[in-house]
């Protein structure tokens, strides 16, 4: 079905471009917004603009942060163990670990995994930034352990293998979360208890 309104059709098309949103869902979202009060729609529009204008990436961990807060709140927290860094694929994975309230170290977000079929190599990820962090020499803040918490996919396994070979010669302990997580499952969809057990049961590579 095509709508007589160009504005309605345009918004449906834009929503349908989002991951996990089909055309029917895009239509429902558009109709919902159409019937919302103007002030609420303007608030949503402003939130979207703020997302692009005010959000950046932490210069240390590469996680999302407000532009005026860099390094991010996690990296600067005095309550965090700065000697342990958990390497994850995406910012959503940081949220998953934070929800468990069991991890007290820092993070490093790669923003992807090695995927030759998609033309994504190590240079396309935040690997150099991770290596730079390992050069810290202060005994109280220098990284002693790197936990590889990459999604258990084929691409994720390739990334883990690459990073473990890259990091071991640097004299840092390299571990990975336990394999109790099903292959092909993304960490952000794992329940807190399972993710906590995977973190606690991590093994050295």
From Swiss-Prot:
A zinc finger (C4-type) spans 58-75. Residues 83-182 form the Toprim domain. Keywords: DNA damage, DNA recombination, DNA repair, Metal-binding, Zinc, Zinc-finger. Coiled coil: none annotated. GO terms for biological process: DNA recombination; DNA repair. It holds the Pfam family Toprim_4. The keyword Repressor does not apply. This is Recombination protein RecR. It comes from Chloroherpeton thalassium (strain ATCC 35110 / GB-78). The lineage of its organism: Bacteria, Pseudomonadati, Chlorobiota, Chlorobiia, Chlorobiales. The gene is recR.
């Amino acid at each position: 079905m095509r709508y007589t309104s160009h504005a309605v059709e345009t918004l449906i098309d834009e929503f349908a471009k989002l991951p996990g949103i089909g055309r029917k869902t895009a239509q429902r979202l558009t109709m919902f917004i159409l019937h919302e009060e103007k002030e609420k729609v303007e608030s949503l529009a402003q939130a979207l603009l703020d997302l692009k204008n005010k959000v950046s990436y932490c210069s240390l961990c590469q996680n999302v942060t407000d532009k005026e807060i860099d390094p991010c709140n996690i990296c600067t927290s005095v309550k965090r163990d700065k000697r342990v860094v958990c390497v994850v694929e995406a910012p959503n994975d940081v949220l998953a670990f934070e929800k468990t309230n069991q991890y007290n170290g820092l993070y490093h977000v790669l923003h992807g995994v090695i995927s030759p079929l998609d033309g994504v190599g190590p240079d396309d990820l935040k690997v150099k930034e991770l290596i730079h962090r390992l050069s810290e020499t202060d005994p109280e803040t220098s990284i002693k352990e790197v936990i590889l918490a990459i999604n258990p996919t084929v691409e994720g396994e390739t990334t883990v293998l690459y990073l473990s070979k890259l990091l071991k010669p640097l004299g840092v302990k390299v571990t990975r979360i336990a394999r109790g997580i099903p292959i092909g499952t993304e960490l952000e969809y794992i329940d807190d208890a399972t993710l906590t057990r995977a973190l606690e049961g991590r093994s050295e590579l």
